Amino acid sequence: MSDNVPTIAAVATAPGRGGVGVIRISGKNLLPMAQALCGKTPEPRVATYADFTDADGQAIDSGLLLFFAAPASFTGEDVIELQGHGGPVVMEMLLNRCLELGARLAEPGEFTKRAFLNDKLDLAQAEGVADLIDASGRSAARLALRSLKGDFSRRIHGLVEGLITLRMLVEAALDFPEEDIDFLEAADARGKLDGLRRAVDDVLANAQQGAILREGLNVVLVGAPNVGKSSLLNALAGDEVAIVTDIAGTTRDAVRERILIDGVPVHIVDTAGLRETDDVVERIGIERSRKAVSEADVALVLVDPREGLNEKTRMILDTLPSDLKRIEIHSKSDLHAHAAGGFGTGAETVIALSAKTGDGLDALKRTLLCEAGWQGESEGLFLARTRHVNALKAAQEELSLAALCGNHQIELFAEHLRLAQVACGEITGEFTADDLLGVIFSRFCIGK
């Protein structure tokens, strides 16, 4: 990083009241600031108890000051942490004092971004920091910690090293074209390529599972009014999150709820009736429902077998994307005999279910996990993101194209290897555009 990087400061603890509040500061040559804050010269990595004072020497608070000298710190710069009482007024006064002493307010994720730019961690590890903070369940937290500790990165670095080794062999063939030697055959380049393809496939499979655990499954409930959508949402959530009445059309806005099934987050939207209306408020709810449908992975199509596929349900089905996966739910199974087969909703799976008794809920949950592609937590999994999966798919494609190259297409073979390496490098940040970095770190919380 440049020598002209400004000092940054932010509250590192969550907003609100608490027993302890932490101010984090990062920059160059912070000992003078530490002395101005507490009147003492702190030793690195030793907790210093002191009064934190304002410009007039009046105490703002008392607590611990921790000093981490560069480069042995999270960001790779000098870092100060002020640990005081966790009241919002105290935190604001301490932060303002830091700003008076020359710091500026940190941007979201800026501490972690500096750690990345100073080679304290790579991009996949940096994302692991945010994913650990945002983990939706225990499984996600465990896998995010593995990514933060570098498990995912080591797998990627292994792929990159293999690609570099193979590229060196290919470059040798390009450097000595006059030699009557089949370099690719002599160096077993084909065998090495096959090994790399298997390794990419393995990492991709793990990344896809990690992405499911991080990002979950988007599900919409659709069906005619009063068919039991809100009752099903409440049953899945285990709480009264949606209003249930005998009056058709009670739900006038999309109701969203997140549940965990075997640690996998499932984002469920109970849609307002997908129909035309002159009611302004209801129209807004319907537009939100249509947006939820466009973003969904699975639609639960609720049908009352006593009525079958009525005209209202047919109209709703016509609004669904043709490629959207569907599960047909025969609702209110406690009130009727199970119907044989489906009603032509386009669903491959039919489940009879009663939101009132809970009959069929477990079968629905298992089916949702199957639709998500979740295979269960296993050793070696790590949390991943969609961008990681896409990068690995790109590398997989380039290696597949390399395998199609003939023995006299060495330059094309080498180019596919290079592009596969670039795709892998995008995951760890070796080859990453600045605008993508901005997007990634802007989604962090301030102070991290």
UniProtKB/Swiss-Prot annotation:
Residues given in the record as (6S)-5-formyl-5,6,7,8-tetrahydrofolate binding sites: R24, E81, K120, K448
A single GO molecular function term of this UniProt record: metal ion binding
PROSITE patterns assigned: G_TRME
Domain TrmE-type G: 216-373
Name listed for the protein in its UniProt record: tRNA modification GTPase MnmE
Positions annotated to bind K(+): N226, T245, I247, T250
Pfam family, one: TrmE_N
GO biological process, alphabetically ordered: tRNA methylation; tRNA wobble uridine modification
Gene: mnmE
Cofactor note: Binds 1 potassium ion per subunit.
Cofactor(s) it depends on: K(+)
PANTHER family: TRNA MODIFICATION GTPASE GTPBP3 (PTHR42714), TRNA MODIFICATION GTPASE GTPBP3, MITOCHONDRIAL (PTHR42714:SF2)
